[in-house]
C-alpha cells in the first residue's frame, strides 16, 4: 500500500518546482544552516569523509560543495587491466546487459527505448542497436562525480527535458520508461571501442547537472537542445580514461552505452552489485 501511494505521489508532485527549491536550499551559504544540514546529512547517510580531499564539513561553502566533494589522490585507483573499461561512478549496478530490439531493461518486465533515452534521434541511436548498456545508481552517500570509462573525444551533447521522478527500486519497478522520461544530459564520445554514450539522468530534487566542458547544463529552458563539438570551427574536447566528465548536484543515475561486439561486462557484476569509480566495469571484445 505504501509503495502504491508513493508511486501515485510521484505523478502528482510538482517535480521541477521541488527540485528548484531543493537547489536553492543546497546553495544556501548561511553558516548555521549549511553546517547543521551538512552534518546531519553526513551522519544520516554515513558518508565516509576520511577519503574526501577536505574532511572538515564546516569548510564547504554550501551543501552542494560538500555533495560534489573531491576525493584525495589515490582514493579511487583506476583498474590497470589492459583495455579495461572503467566504472564511471560510485554506486550500485541497477541493471546491465544487451540492448535487445532497441530496448534497455529497467526492472521486472519494464524496459525503455534506447532511442528515446538518447533524445529521439534515430541516427544517434543506430550505432548502439544490439549493443550493451550498464545503469549505475548513485546513492546519497556516494561520491557524485562521473568519470570517463574510456578515453574519448566528445562529438555531441544533448539536453533532453523531462519529468523528475525519484529514482529507486520502487520507481524502477512501477514507472514505465523511467529513465527515458526523466530530464537528462546525453554525452556522445568517439573511443577506441567505437561510439560511447554516457547519459546523466536527473531525478526529483536533483537541482542540476554539470559537465566539465559546458558547466551547468540543467536547468535551462526546458526544450531539447543539441550541442555539436565535432565541427571544424571548434577545438576538439578529448578526455582521458578516468578523467572527470561531470557531476550531479543531488543525485541520480549514469547510463553507459556501447555498440555491438565491443565490450564484455565483468563477470563479477550484476544487478545490485556495489561499484566504485575506476574499478573494472567491462573488458574489450577482441576482434
Curated annotation (Swiss-Prot):
One of its GO terms (cellular component) is plasma membrane. The active site is at 90 (charge relay system), 147 (charge relay system), 252 (charge relay system), 252 (schiff-base intermediate with substrate). It comes from the Bacteria. InterPro entries: PS_Dcarbxylase, PSD-B, PSD_type1_pro. The modification Pyruvic acid (Ser) is found at residue 252. Pathway: Phospholipid metabolism; phosphatidylethanolamine biosynthesis; phosphatidylethanolamine from CDP-diacylglycerol: step 2/2. It is an enzyme of class 4 (lyase). This is Phosphatidylserine decarboxylase proenzyme. The gene is psd.
Amino acid at each position: 500500500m505504501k509503495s502504491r501511494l508513493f508511486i501515485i505521489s510521484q505523478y502528482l508532485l510538482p517535480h521541477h518546482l521541488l527540485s528548484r527549491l531543493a537547489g536553492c536550499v543546497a546553495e544556501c551559504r548561511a553558516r548555521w544552516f549549511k553546517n547543521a544540514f551538512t552534518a546531519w546529512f553526513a551522519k544520516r547517510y554515513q558518508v565516509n569523509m576520511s577519503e574526501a580531499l577536505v574532511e572538515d564539513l564546516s569548510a564547504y561553502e554550501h551543501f552542494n560543495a560538500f555533495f560534489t566533494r573531491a576525493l584525495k589522490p589515490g582514493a579511487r585507483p583506476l583498474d590497470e587491466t589492459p583495455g579495461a573499461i572503467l566504472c564511471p561512478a560510485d554506486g550500485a549496478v541497477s541493471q546491465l546487459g544487451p540492448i535487445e530490439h532497441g530496448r534497455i531493461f529497467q526492472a521486472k518486465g519494464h524496459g525503455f527505448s534506447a532511442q528515446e533515452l538518447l533524445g529521439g534521434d534515430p541516427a544517434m541511436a543506430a550505432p548502439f542497436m544490439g549493443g550493451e548498456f550498464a545503469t549505475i545508481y548513485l546513492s546519497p552517500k556516494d561520491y557524485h562525480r562521473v568519470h570517463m570509462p574510456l578515453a574519448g573525444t566528445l562529438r555531441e551533447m544533448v539536453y533532453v527535458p523531462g519529468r523528475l521522478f525519484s529514482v529507486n527500486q520502487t520507481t524502477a519497478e512501477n514507472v514505465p520508461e523511467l529513465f527515458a522520461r526523466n530530464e537528462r544530459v546525453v554525452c556522445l564520445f568517439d573511443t577506441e571501442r567505437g561510439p560511447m554514450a554516457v547519459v546523466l539522468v536527473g531525478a526529483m530534487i536533483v537541482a542540476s547537472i554539470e559537465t566539465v566542458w559546458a558547466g551547468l547544463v540543467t536547468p535551462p529552458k526546458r526544450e531539447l537542445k543539441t550541442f555539436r563539438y565535432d565541427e571544424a570551427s571548434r577545438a576538439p574536447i578529448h578526455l582521458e580514461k578516468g578523467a572527470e566528465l561531470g557531476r550531479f548536484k543531488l543525485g541520480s543515475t549514469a547510463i553507459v552505452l556501447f555498440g555491438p561486439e565491443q565490450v564484455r561486462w565483468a563477470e563479477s557484476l550484476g544487478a545490485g552489485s556495489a561499484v566504485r569509480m575506476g574499478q573494472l566495469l567491462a573488458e574489450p571484445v577482441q576482434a
